A protein has these predicted regions:
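Short, aromatic-enriched amphipathic alpha-helices that serve as compact interaction elements
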Residues: 23-41
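Low-complexity, intrinsically disordered terminal/linker segments enriched in charged
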Residues: 95-99, 109-112, 130-147
Length: 147
């Protein structure tokens, strides 16, 4: 009985630390795009701009920008105001000092989209430091639409 209780406590402790980051860069990116479904539920309306989501997914230097941006003409993470995503391809481009660069490619309504996620391994797991599209970065995009 004590072993079972110890196992449950260990699992719960692991879950609480995973709530503020992710175990791998690939897991982080997969979890971002899990929010981009067919909008049939609240979990498929795009990545929410609330404080809890910001804490889980973003580096502290990007959290305020994520939660305070309003009036964006499109969702930066899918490069469109609407989405119907095909398969998401994820690969590690390079690891450089404290940052890891993750290439992401997918089709959105039949249009090819490529993004580079720059992720860092924080105290609670992997989080997004920035995201680059061929023409812009998430940090610059959010600065344009800050509330």
């Amino acid at each position: 009985m004590i072993k079972v209780l110890a196992t449950i406590l260990a699992l719960l402790a692991g879950l609480s630390t995973a709530a503020a980051g992710f175990r791998s860069p690939e897991s982080l990116v997969r979890n971002v795009y899990a929010y981009y479904g067919d909008r049939s539920s609240d979990l498929s309306n795009g990545l929410p701009h609330d404080a809890d989501t910001a804490r889980r997914f973003f580096d502290p230097s990007l959290q305020v920008a994520w939660t305070s941006s309003k009036g964006q003409p499109y969702d930066f993470l899918v490069q469109s105001p609407t989405w119907k995503l095909g398969a998401v391809s994820i690969s590690i481009l390079r690891k450089q000092f404290d940052k890891t660069y993750v290439a992401v490619a997918f089709d959105n309504h039949g249009r090819a989209v490529t993004m580079n996620f720059i992720v860092v391994n924080g105290p609670d797991g992997w989080v997004i430091y920035d995201v680059e599209s061929p023409h812009d970065s998430l940090r610059m995009f959010l600065a344009q639409y800050r509330n």
